């Protein structure tokens, strides 16, 4: 199957916020955040796999993948001996996963790996409001977010999730930073 996810907010699920098992999938200018408050055994923000079906292409561009866990991305390669494809690329993204080793780096272009110890610019601090106690969330960007002005102007969508123009310096994720939003 062919799937295009653009300007989308996929957040706070008990299971994975986005799960891909094979296909030809592009995710662009989206926010995928796992801040589900009711179960410590919640799944990851993003799970992609070529285990059951060939992952012909998984491309994530100009997107944020974050959450409570130190690793919010799970990639499952096909079993040894399988002929299933497992093709993936991340570009101009901010992702909460440990930095990859040299043999994996070819799959990551202009990607920021979140520093889980940075409590100012990453994780829930990207966003205007993450209040698990009151179950109130606003995934628009805060002025401290590392996502501001970091998207690729050539590949980012021209408008954000709210229909606002992204301009010459688009932000990573589903929403453009708005000065008066906070």
Name these PLM-found stretches.
Residues 2-138:
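Predominantly extracellular beta-rich ligand-binding scaffolds that present long acidic/polar faces
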Residues 135-182:
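Surface beta-loop-beta hairpin patches that serve as ligand-binding interfaces in beta-rich domains
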């Amino acid at each position: 199957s062919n799937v295009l996810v653009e300007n989308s907010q996929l957040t706070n699920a008990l299971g994975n916020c986005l799960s891909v098992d094979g296909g030809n999938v592009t995710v662009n200018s989206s926010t995928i955040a796992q801040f589900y408050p009711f179960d410590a055994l919640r799944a990851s923000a993003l799970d992609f796999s070529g285990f059951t079906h060939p992952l012909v292409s998984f491309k994530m561009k100009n997107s944020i993948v974050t959450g409570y866990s130190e690793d919010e991305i799970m990639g499952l390669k096909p079993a040894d001996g399988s002929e299933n494809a497992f093709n993936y690329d991340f570009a101009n993204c901010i992702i909460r996963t440990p930095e990859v080793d040299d043999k994996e780096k070819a799959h990551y272009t202009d990607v920021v790996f979140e520093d889980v110890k940075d409590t100012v610019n990453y994780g829930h601090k990207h966003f205007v409001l993450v209040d698990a106690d009151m179950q109130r969330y606003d995934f628009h960007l805060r002025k401290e977010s590392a996502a501001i002005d970091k998207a690729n102007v050539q590949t980012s969508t021209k408008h954000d999730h709210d229909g606002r123009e992204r301009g010459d310096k688009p932000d990573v994720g589903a929403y453009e930073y708005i000065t008066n939003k906070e």
